[in-house]
C-alpha cells in the first residue's frame, strides 16, 4: 500500500524536515539528523511528535503520514520497537480526541506493512483500542474469519491470541455490537484446551452473563460444550446457564428464590430474566405441542388471562415461535418453534425431513419424465 509522505525527498532529508517542523512547534529535538541512522532519527521524532498531534492545522496528517512512511521502509528488526512506541502515543494521546486522525494513521500503518509481519498484531490492537474509545469499531475490520487468518499469519502465541480476542470482544460490547461480540467470546473460549481451561474462568463467567443479559439471545446450549464453561460445573453460574438452556420458568423462579443475592451480583435483572424464561418455556411447549390452551399457558408461564394475547404477540416478534391465537377455543395453534437445544434427536428429525423432501422431489422428477415421454 502507498502511504502519503510529508515531502518527496530522500529519507535523510525527510527526517531533517520533520525535525525542523517539530522544533518549530516547540518540541525539544535537534534539527540535525543523528549519526546513528534513520531508525535513531525516527525514535527521536516519535518521542517528540506529541506537539504535532496537538496542532489543528492541515499539515498534521501529512507530517504523521511521513513518519509512517519512513517506518515502513526500515528493516523489520528495527521496526518493532518504533512501531510499538508510535502506537502507544496514538492510543494514549488525549483519549477520545482526534479519533479520525489517529484511526487513519494506524490504518495506514497497518495496511502498509507486510501481511505476515508479527508486529501488525500491535497495530491492530491499537486500532481496536482507539476505535472503541470513540465508538467507531465499525470503521475497522473485525470480521471473525479475517481475524482468525491474521492470528494464523502472525503466528501469535496463545497469550497474544487470547489478548487480541478479549480486546476485540470488549470493544464490540462497548460499541453495542452484541451479536459480533458473542461470536468473538465463543471463539475465545473455544481456543482453550483441557490444560488451560481453568485459566478462563473470568472469561467464561463473563460470557455466560453477557449471553443471559442480551435481549436478543435465546439459544445457549452451544455454551455448555465450551471447555472453560464445563470447568464451571457445580457452580451457581453453571446451574443458572443450565436452567436457561433447557429448564422451565418454575425452575428459574425456585433458583431465584434461593439465590437472589447471586442474581443481583451478576447485574442481571430479575424481571428481564422472567420475561426471557417465559419465552424459552413457551418455545419448549410449542415444540412438543401444536396446540396449547390458554389455561396451560397461564399456569406454565405464570401470567394472567389478560396477558396471554400480548405475550403471544411478543413471542412471535422474536421469530423464535410462529403461531396464531384461536380466541374462540382459547388456545394457541403452533406452526413452528425453534428448538432450545439441538442434539441427536434434532439431527435425526432434520435428516428425516430432508430425506422426505428428496423422495418427494424424485417422485416429481419421475412424473415429469413420464409426461415428457408421452
UniProtKB/Swiss-Prot annotation:
Gene Ontology molecular function, alphabetical: translation initiation factor activity
Keyword Phosphoprotein: yes
KW Ribonucleoprotein (keyword) present: no
UniProt cross-references to SMART domains, sorted A to Z: PINT
Location in the cell: Cytoplasm
All copies of domain PCI, residue ranges: 180-339
Residues found modified as N6-acetyllysine: 254
Alphabetically ordered keywords of this record: Acetylation, Cytoplasm, Initiation factor, Phosphoprotein, Protein biosynthesis
GO biological process, one term: formation of cytoplasmic translation initiation complex
Segments crossing the lipid bilayer: none
Assembly notes: Component of the eukaryotic translation initiation factor 3 (eIF-3) complex, which is composed of 13 subunits: EIF3A, EIF3B, EIF3C, EIF3D, EIF3E, EIF3F, EIF3G, EIF3H, EIF3I, EIF3J, EIF3K, EIF3L and EIF3M. The eIF-3 complex appears to include 3 stable modules: module A is composed of EIF3A, EIF3B, EIF3G and EIF3I; module B is composed of EIF3F, EIF3H, and EIF3M; and module C is composed of EIF3C, EIF3D, EIF3E, EIF3K and EIF3L. EIF3C of module C binds EIF3B of module A and EIF3H of module B, thereby linking the three modules. EIF3J is a labile subunit that binds to the eIF-3 complex via EIF3B.
HAMAP family: eIF3m
Family of the protein in this entry: Belongs to the eIF-3 subunit M family.
Record function comment: Component of the eukaryotic translation initiation factor 3 (eIF-3) complex, which is required for several steps in the initiation of protein synthesis. The eIF-3 complex associates with the 40S ribosome and facilitates the recruitment of eIF-1, eIF-1A, eIF-2:GTP:methionyl-tRNAi and eIF-5 to form the 43S pre-initiation complex (43S PIC). The eIF-3 complex stimulates mRNA recruitment to the 43S PIC and scanning of the mRNA for AUG recognition.
UniProt name for this protein: Eukaryotic translation initiation factor 3 subunit M
Amino acid at each position: 500500500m502507498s502511504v502519503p509522505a510529508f515531502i518527496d525527498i530522500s529519507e535523510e532529508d525527510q527526517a531533517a524536515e520533520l525535525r525542523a517542523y517539530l522544533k518549530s512547534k516547540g518540541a525539544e529535538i535537534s534539527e540535525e539528523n543523528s549519526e546513528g541512522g534513520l531508525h535513531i532519527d525516527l525514535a527521536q521524532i516519535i518521542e517528540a511528535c506529541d506537539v504535532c498531534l496537538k496542532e489543528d492545522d492541515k499539515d498534521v496528517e501529512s507530517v504523521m503520514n511521513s513518519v509512517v512512511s519512513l517506518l515502513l521502509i526500515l528493516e523489520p528488526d528495527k521496526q518493532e520497537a518504533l512501531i510499538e512506541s508510535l502506537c502507544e502515543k496514538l492510543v494514549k494521546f488525549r483519549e477520545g480526541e482526534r479519533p479520525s486522525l489517529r484511526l487513519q494513521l494506524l490504518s495506514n500503518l497497518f495496511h502498509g506493512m507486510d501481511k505476515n509481519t508479527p508486529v501488525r498484531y500491535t497495530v491492530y490492537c491499537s486500532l481496536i483500542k482507539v476505535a472503541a474509545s470513540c465508538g467507531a469499531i465499525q470503521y475497522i475490520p473485525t470480521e471473525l474469519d479475517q481475524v482468525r487468518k491474521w492470528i494464523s499469519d502472525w503466528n501469535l502465541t496463545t497469550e497474544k491470541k487470547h489478548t487480541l480476542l478479549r480486546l476485540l470482544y470488549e470493544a464490540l460490547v462497548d460499541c453495542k455490537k452484541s451479536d459480533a461480540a458473542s461470536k468473538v467470546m465463543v471463539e475465545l473460549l473455544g481456543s482453550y484446551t483441557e490444560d488451560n481451561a481453568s485459566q478462563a474462568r473470568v472469561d467464561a463467567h463473563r460470557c455466560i452473563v453477557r449471553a443471559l443479559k442480551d435481549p436478543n439471545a435465546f439459544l445457549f446450549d452451544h455454551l455448555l460444550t465450551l471447555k472453560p464453561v464445563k470447568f464451571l460445573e457445580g457452580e451457581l453460574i453453571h446451574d443458572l446457564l443450565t436452567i436457561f438452556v433447557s429448564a422451565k420458568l418454575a425452575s428459574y423462579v425456585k433458583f431465584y428464590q434461593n439465590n437472589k443475592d447471586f442474581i443481583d451480583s451478576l447485574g442481571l435483572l430479575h424481571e428481564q430474566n422472567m420475561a426471557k424464561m417465559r419465552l424459552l418455556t413457551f418455545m419448549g411447549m410449542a415444540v412438543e405441542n401444536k396446540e396449547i390452551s390458554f389455561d396451560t399457558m397461564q399456569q406454565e408461564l405464570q401470567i394472567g388471562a389478560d396477558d396471554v394475547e400480548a405475550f403471544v404477540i411478543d413471542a412471535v416478534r422474536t421469530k423464535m415461535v410462529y403461531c396464531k391465537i384461536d380466541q374462540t377455543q382459547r388456545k394457541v395453534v403452533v406452526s413452528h418453534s425453534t428448538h432450545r437445544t439441538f442434539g441427536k434427536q434434532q439431527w435425526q428429525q432434520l435428516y428425516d425431513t430432508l430425506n422426505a423432501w428428496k423422495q418427494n422431489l424424485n417422485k416429481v422428477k419421475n412424473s415429469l419424465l413420464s409426461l415428457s415421454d408421452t
